[in-house]
């Protein structure tokens, strides 16, 4: 049962990956439309990507911990 739980926990890594892809695509479009706002958009994009990546790492660690029990 632990391995099933670990596999389900690792599905949580897919969400942040999709989120980062959408975030990057929309930020690139926004910078293309308004180049003057690029520094602000880039900073917000990096913060959002870091938060999403943190969730992915947390799901990965939970999956590893469940697999090792």
Give, region by region, the residue ranges found by the protein language model.
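Hydrophobic, small-residue-rich transmembrane alpha-helices and their short perimembrane loops
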Residues: 1-69
């Amino acid at each position: 049962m632990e391995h099933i739980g670990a596999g389900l926990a690792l599905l949580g890594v897919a969400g942040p990956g999709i989120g980062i892809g959408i975030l990057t695509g929309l930020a690139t479009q926004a910078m293309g439309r308004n180049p003057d706002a690029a520094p602000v958009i880039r900073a917000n994009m990096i913060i959002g990507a870091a938060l999403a990546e943190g969730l992915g790492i947390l799901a990965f660690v939970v999956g590893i911990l469940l697999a090792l029990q």
